[in-house]
Amino acid sequence: MTHAVAASPPSTRHLVGWSGKARRFGQSLHLREDELHDLLLQAPEVIAENLLWIGAQIKTGNGRKLDLLGLTRCGALIVIEVRRSENAAEALAAAIIHQQWARSLSIHDLIGHYEEFCGGQLLVDFYNAFADAIELSGNVTLCVVAPDVRRIAASIAALDASGIGAFGVEFE
């Protein structure tokens, strides 16, 4: 999956997709990390089309918390790590750790996280959103949201080339 390229003035946000391409997303943001979480929760299409949020601030069992976890229509999980500070490399390292944890999740685990997150019934809500049953693909894609994602573009491209789906969302 690739994203279209568009000219972008310096004050815009960019989405760096699987292909390493960038597209204009929006205006300059001066938000706290929790506000970025809220923005992403309200606009999941920034991360992926047909995305259902499974949870936020999920305890992963290794003393860390995963910022956001989404499930695509095709059954792939997306691990989102958000950093307000200019340290995308740190966010990428955390996302890789979370990816390993996410790979071990069963459908029952996802149901539990979803119920804790929004009180909904995952199987019903997924069907209502996508008119389909959940079939986990086993794929887990990494997403880093940080102001300096371009600094780690080579690392993201290397992960993607090795078969680990990865992309970033950059903002000012």
Model-derived segments and spans:
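Charged, terminal alpha-helix-loop-beta segments
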Residues: 1-172
